[in-house]
Regions:
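Extended, non-catalytic subsegments within catalytic or DNA/protein-binding/adaptor domains
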Residues: 1-203
Length: 203
């Protein structure tokens, strides 16, 4: 409840819901009681929705059922690329999976995803990852912020991130990059407007 109150002035209600979902999944996976189901949390979320009501301008957030469908498609595509030796396709789909899962569980916007850098992400095996962003919406002091994401038993953003940077051999620079038809990974990041279309192509 305190977490919701702290971030209510700077985060949209849909982003808060996504973060609650990630917290809920982590506690369930670890065998802990789910704190997000408490009456206090529901009451605080309802109050935030009323107090910080704004016209909804964002696209509807990806729902968990749709996320699972896309992830299943990507899993098949990655397997097919591995068996056929199609490295360009393997790189693209592995990147897209990491982009999708990290964007979903952290509620990152497209501009935040493309600004992520490998050297600013710290992974703790079996626990989660911490992503530092130098520029974020609502960061009035321009000091940057650290976003934490837990490791999950499935649809795990940490596993997907590790798979992508390992496959692409990335040690620094942008996390999510362009890939040409020959499988060359570019030095520069994806364009801010290109991340969403990448995830719509399977459907």
């Amino acid at each position: 409840a305190r977490y919701l109150a702290d971030y209510a002035p700077t985060l949209a209600i849909n982003t808060l819901r996504l973060r609650l979902a990630a917290l809920s999944r982590w506690h369930t996976d670890q065998g802990f009681a789910d704190p997000t189901k408490s009456p206090l949390v529901r009451q605080v979320l309802k109050g935030i929705r009323s107090l910080h009501a704004v016209p909804e301008k964002r696209a509807r957030p990806l729902e968990l059922a749709v996320l699972q469908q896309i992830d299943q498609w990507l899993d098949v595509a990655i397997g097919n690329a591995q068996r056929s030796g199609d490295r360009p396709a393997l790189l693209r789909q592995t990147r897209n999976r990491s982009l999708m899962l990290l964007g979903f569980w952290r509620g990152f916007r497209s501009d935040e995803l493309v600004n992520l850098r490998v050297e600013n992400i710290e992974v703790t095996p079996g626990q989660g990852m911490a992503c530092y962003l130098g520029r974020t919406k609502g960061d009035r002091q321009l000091q940057g912020r650290v976003f934490k994401c837990p490791a999950l038993s499935r649809l795990c953003p940490v596993t997907a991130f590790n798979a992508w940077v390992s496959l692409a051999g990335l040690t620094e620079g942008p996390v999510f990059r362009k890939i040409d038809r020959w499988g060359h990974v570019a030095e520069e990041s994806l364009h801010v407007n290109s991340s969403i279309p990448l995830l719509r192509r399977p459907f």
